[in-house]
Amino acid sequence: MAAAATMAAAARELVLRAGASDVEEEEGPLGGGSGLQEPLQLGELDITSDEFILDEVDVHIQANLEDELVKEALKTGVDLRHYSKQVELELQQIEQKSIRDYIQESENIASLHNQITACDAVLERMEQMLGAFQSDLSSISSEIRTLQEQSGAMNIRLRNRQAVRGKLGELVDGLVVPSALVTAILEAPVTEPRFLEQLQELDAKAAAVREQEAMGTAACADVRGVLDRLRVKAVTKIREFILQKIYSFRKPMTNYQIPQAALLKYRFFYQFLLGNERATAKEIRDEYVETLSKIYLSYYRSYVGRLMKVQYEEVAEKDDLMGVEDTAKKGFFSKPSLRSRNTIFTLGTRGTVISPAELEAPILVPHTAQRGEQRYPFEALFRSQHYALLDNSCREYLFICEFFIVSGPAAHDLFHAVMGRTLSMTLKHLESYLADCYDAIAVFLCIHIVLRFRNIAAKRDVPALDRYWEQVLALLWPRFELILEMNVQSVRSTDPQRLGGLDTRPHYITRRYAEFSSALVSINQTIPNERTLQLLGQLQVEVENFVLRVAAEFSSRKEQLVFLINNYDMMLGVLMERAADDSKEVESFQQLLNARTQEFIEELLSPPFGGLVAFVKEAEALIERGQAERLRGEEARVTQLIRGFGSSWKASVESLSQDVMRSFTNFRNGTSIIQGALTQLIQLYHRFHRVLSQPQLRALPARAELINIHHLMVELKKHKPNF
């Protein structure tokens, strides 16, 4: 409709302008249609406003020309005036139709107006109702807030009353003394369970009353008297019971572990005394310390004394040293020596005392051993004595910590109050024994027993014996070192000329050393100690020097080598039975044995084959220096060597084998030496063959008499000893 109206207006405007234009054309330029041109008196013209109006018209026309309907009308060549009238007619028809429609719907419109008016009235009433409801809600909200505040205050008062009630209930329960408690404390024996239960209740009430009294609670005065009387009664009964148990320790042949177990069952008794009657608790502790310290001292003094009676009667003395000759003590007034002095240098089965099975074996019973006429070395007695000490000390320490409720330094002090006198007595006895002890193996075994017992005590979490173990080791180590140094000095000062007749067999001093060293090395391997290895190293040096001094007494080098080899082989064999193959002692004697064996083989081959050895060495030296031509003058010597070897080698080898087997006590060592000698002989003859293959000696007629090297090897194998 708007577009049509716009187009109609535009059409009317165009029609008007077109009409004006036509009129002007009809009138012509002269007006009136006369065709004459009359000058116009227009005066001063102001065309500014007209130009502005034309501009607006142009813009309006241009805008209308953009309309689709106008474009379509212009395109089809429609007469705008006719089209404008048609449009105007249509607009009038539409207007009239609209008026008719409005008149037809006037009743509906009036009804709609009435309905709208009624709705406005209803909405107004609802607005009033909602306003009243909002006002009511505001008042209700304030009432709810008031109720919430009142409820919170009531909750706080309730919680406060409940808290007060709970504390008052606890206070009353803690202060009230029930009749069951009174009856149990006064009438029940201390061994009954209900006495212990009510004693714990009494302890709790006494603690509660003390706490409340500190805070100024007046109600405590009402029950203080009753609780004090009950406490005194309970303390009296507990004191009598515990002292009775302590006195039972004093009965002869009493197994004090039984009363200790009974005391542990009622350990709360002492806890009660400690919290309610410290004077009585101290009295009981002092009585326990005094009683048990005397019992332990008496028991161990008796046990150690009876234990020493089953020691071997024959013990090492100051003259039983490694370097002391067997004939030194034989005199008119001298005591008979040990059945065999060598036994004090031999470990034998003594080392089993530090094995796990023997270490914690039951202790020795002296009277049983005496009835069976059994005797033991000192280390076995030491093990039994200290295992009993370890076992009882561990049990005592744990009992003290649990029953007397102590730990740390306090537990150590209480333990030493009980066991201190016993430990001191044991140390004095050990010190007295060691002052006259010359058995190094026994002392060394005792050291290792202590090291193992110290580990056991640590595993049992009993540190109270740590200082005692250190004191024992402080006695054992210096004595062990002193005995070892005495043996070193005895070997150093031994004069070979005073040892009697010379013999190439192993010397008894070297045998003592081998047994002694292997014993200490095998023990030391379990818990290595560098100081022990140093002392053994000093002893080894002195023994090696001693062997060389004795060997120097032989007139021939061959006898010297036989003596050295026999002694080195014996010492090496004994050491390898107990010590590790890679120990310093084994490696050292292995090197010495190999060196002397090689020298002996050369000495052994020298008489029968010395000429051959000398020629081969000279010839190889000439060949190496490039002077092989000088071998041409040795034909006669070579011929003699070939024929001499061919005629005598079998007899020489036979004599050599017999000589070796006579010289060496160890058949295996003798066999090894023979094998080494035959091997070296084959190598020597093979080298002789290589020398004769030189051009200067290749044409020698005597080469035909050479023994085939393979034939020689086959023949020499026949002389290999079989054991």
UniProtKB/Swiss-Prot annotation:
One Pfam family of this chain: Vps52_CC
Alphabetic keyword roster: Acetylation, Coiled coil, Endosome, Golgi apparatus, Membrane, Phosphoprotein, Protein transport, Transport
Family the UniProt entry places it in: Belongs to the VPS52 family.
Gene Ontology biological-process annotations: ectodermal cell differentiation; embryonic ectodermal digestive tract development; endocytic recycling; lysosomal transport; protein targeting; protein transport; vesicle-mediated cholesterol transport
Modified residues (Phosphoserine): S355
Molecular function in Gene Ontology: syntaxin binding
Chain coiled-coil ranges: 107-127, 194-214
Purpose of the protein: Acts as a component of the GARP complex that is involved in retrograde transport from early and late endosomes to the trans-Golgi network (TGN). The GARP complex is required for the maintenance of the cycling of mannose 6-phosphate receptors between the TGN and endosomes, this cycling is necessary for proper lysosomal sorting of acid hydrolases such as CTSD. Acts as a component of the EARP complex that is involved in endocytic recycling. The EARP complex associates with Rab4-positive endosomes and promotes recycling of internalized transferrin receptor (TFRC) to the plasma membrane.
Principal subcellular localization: Golgi
GO cellular component: cytosol; EARP complex; endosome membrane; GARP complex; membrane; perinuclear region of cytoplasm; postsynapse; presynapse
Subunit and partners: Component of the Golgi-associated retrograde protein (GARP) complex, also called VFT (VPS fifty-three) complex, composed of VPS51, VPS52, VPS53 and VPS54. Component of the endosome-associated retrograde protein (EARP) complex, composed of VPS51, VPS52, VPS53 and VPS50/Syndetin. EIPR1 interacts with both EARP and GARP complexes and mediates the recruitment of the GARP complex to the trans-Golgi network. Interacts with RAB6A and STX10. Interacts with BLTP3B.
Subcellular locations according to the entry: Golgi apparatus, trans-Golgi network membrane; Endosome membrane; Recycling endosome
Membrane topology listed for this record: Peripheral membrane protein
Organism: Mus musculus
Protein name: Vacuolar protein sorting-associated protein 52 homolog
Modified residues (N-acetylalanine): A2
